From Swiss-Prot:
SMART domains: S_TKc. Keywords: ATP-binding, Kinase, Nucleotide-binding, Phosphoprotein, Serine/threonine-protein kinase, Transferase. The modification Phosphothreonine is found at residue 205. This is Mitogen-activated protein kinase kinase 8. GO terms for molecular function: ATP binding; MAP kinase kinase activity; protein serine kinase activity; protein serine/threonine kinase activity; protein tyrosine kinase activity. InterPro entries: Kinase-like_dom_sf (IPR011009), Prot_kinase_dom (IPR000719), Protein_kinase_ATP_BS (IPR017441), Ser_Thr_kinase (IPR053235). ATP binds at residues 59-67, 82. The modification Phosphoserine is found at residues 195, 201.
Length: 309
């Protein structure tokens, strides 16, 4: 099945999926986080009540539902409450399942999940006061390194626990005034059950897809490339960081032009005026062959990140 998150490029109609009436129990254990305090609770903690949350404003609305800024009446803490659309489907189920699993300071935390008698589902999450990276443009190399390190820490955590995001882009990376950056939106993510379970299906946002995801049958795409299930996330990450650096999407925002550029052209590169370390970093993220792209773990040890300390 084909699913594209950004309909400005493709307008595809999917067969309707019958929504279940209740959330199924989580089939996977909560994953312990590295570098996280032992006091951090699991997602379904039952420590919150919807009645105890005051809605302050609407933060955004999309295919997955509406997100509100809310305040806990007891603690005065601010959170984001995602109200899933009534006709929630496998995309919503997938996001809920993954949110129940993950526990990392580099991934937007799920504090609780609520379901009312009518079946309406809401997810209480971290509130990131500066919104997404979508509005952030023209940063310094030092700022880019700080953001890149946090996103890669999150990617490394997810990949180590066999979760492929498949929709890394500026809109799905959230930031706070504390200089925190966290990965969000797991609607099209996938849990890799077997090490060779291919996740290069055509899902995510078209403009940020890697060559092997745009066309897995193209000349030069090997079985090794297809089985490298995590490399597509690295391409999307590299393109996202390059966009934030230069201040605009680095390719023509047209479907045919993107396919030609990504699948048949040279990979995007950092501007000439950038440092050699940054040029190398981008090259390691945006190699055409998936098998040649660096992993999140390798990129965390790249000189571009190490030399910014």
């Amino acid at each position: 099945m084909v699913m594209v998150r950004d309909n400005q490029f493709l307008n595809l109609k999917l067969s309707p999926i019958q929504a279940p009436t209740t959330i199924p129990p989580c089939r996977f254990p909560i994953i312990p986080a590295t570098k996280v305090s032992a006091t951090v609770s699991s997602c379904a903690s039952n420590t919150f009540s919807v009645a105890n949350l005051d809605r302050i404003s609407v933060l955004g609305s999309g295919n997955g539902g509406t997100v509100f800024k809310v305040k806990d009446k007891t603690t005065s803490e601010i959170y984001a409450l995602k109200k899933v659309k009534e006709n929630w489907d496998s995309t919503s189920l997938r996001e809920i399942e993954i949110l129940r699993m993950v526990n990392s300071p580099y991934v937007a935390k799920c504090h609780d999940i609520f379901q009312n008698p009518s079946g309406e589902v809401s997810i209480l999450m971290d509130y990131m006061d500066l919104g997404s990276l979508e509005s952030l443009r023209g940063v310094t190399e030092k700022q880019l390194a700080l953001m890149s390190r946090q996103v890669l820490e999150g990617k490394n955590y997810l990949h180590e626990h066999k979760i492929v995001h498949r929709d890394i882009k500026p809109a799905n990376l959230l930031r706070s005034s504390k200089e925190e950056v966290k990965i969000a939106d797991f609607g099209v993510s996938k849990i890799v059950v077997r090490s060779l379970n291919k996740c290069n299906s055509f899902v995510g946002t078209f403009a940020y897809m890697s060559p092997e995801r745009l066309d897995s049958e193209a000349d030069g795409v090997t079985e090794e490339d297809k089985s490298n299930v995590y490399a597509g996330d690295i391409w999307s990450f590299g393109l996202t960081m390059l966009e934030i650096l230069v201040g605009y999407y680095p390719m023509l925002p047209d479907q045919a032009a993107i396919v030609c550029a990504v699948c048949f052209g040279e990979p995007p590169k950092a501007p000439e005026e950038c440092s050699d370390d940054l040029k190398s970093f981008m090259d390691c993220c945006l190699r055409k062959k998936a098998s040649e792209r660096w992993t999140a773990s390798q990129l965390l040890n790249h000189p571009f990140l190490l030399h910014q300390d």
